A protein has these predicted regions:
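Catalytic alpha/beta core domains of metabolic enzymes, predominantly
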Residues: 1-118
Length: 120
């Protein structure tokens, strides 16, 4: 970070990729990634980025694993999620997180996207 700032890159433009390893091969790495996100965000004060779908490589029902991991990562300080925006569960997880974390003030985005859906 110091080197980047010394070269004229503003701190707010620096994103750290904490790397996502597949849970099927490195299951203990899941919590390490989440802890790294938390540390980068809260101790270093930097923004974070993550390729979310890497977590589920080689597993069945990848969408389920991906959207739960995305929610866990957001809770631990993820700023920029590399996801497939065409998967409703992924965009839904982001919208629900923003609603519950009080980022989506007055639920505007959530209601705009889901207000016409029937209540189940």
């Amino acid at each position: 970070m110091d080197r980047a700032v010394a070269m004229g890159i503003p701190k707010e433009d620096i994103y750290i990729d904490c790397l996502t390893l597949t849970a099927s091969a490195e299951q203990e790495g899941v919590m390490e990634t989440l802890n790294a996100l938390h540390t980068v965000k809260n101790e270093l004060g930097l923004k974070t980025v993550l390729g979310v779908s890497n977590i589920s490589f080689g597993l069945p029902n990848r969408v389920l694993v991906n959207h739960i991991f995305l929610t866990m990562a957001l809770t631990n300080g993820l700023d920029l999620a590399i996801i497939n925006p065409n998967i409703p569960e992924m965009t839904g997880a982001v919208r629900a997180y923003k609603l519950l974390a009080n980022i989506d003030k007055n639920s505007v985005d959530y209601i705009k996207n889901y207000g016409a859906m029937p209540n189940v």
